[in-house]
């Protein structure tokens, strides 16, 4: 996997990788990350990936990070509770 581009953003670290015929877009915020994959042949070039990182999309990413953080914190707080009988 090789890094092909960093997309500047004031809050997130956005890195684009190329691997196995796909672009892998990794968006990081603190200890969480989201990863999106797209076939290289589906886009005309890396500029299209820049355009995909629009404000509406990144606001949804931020919301998802918030939800992920809440889920993780809840799991962390409850880690000592009796395990589910299905585990």
What is each model feature region?
Residues 2-39:
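N-terminal acidic leader/helix
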């Amino acid at each position: 996997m090789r890094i092909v581009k960093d997309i500047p953003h004031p809050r997130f670290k956005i890195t684009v990788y190329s691997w196995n015929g796909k672009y892998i877009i990794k968006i990081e915020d603190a200890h969480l990350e989201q990863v999106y994959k797209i076939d290289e042949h589906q886009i005309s070039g890396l500029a299209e990936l820049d355009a995909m990182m629009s404000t509406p999309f990144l606001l949804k990413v931020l919301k998802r990070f918030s939800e992920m953080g809440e889920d993780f914190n809840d799991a962390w707080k409850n880690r000592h509770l009796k395990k589910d009988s299905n585990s």
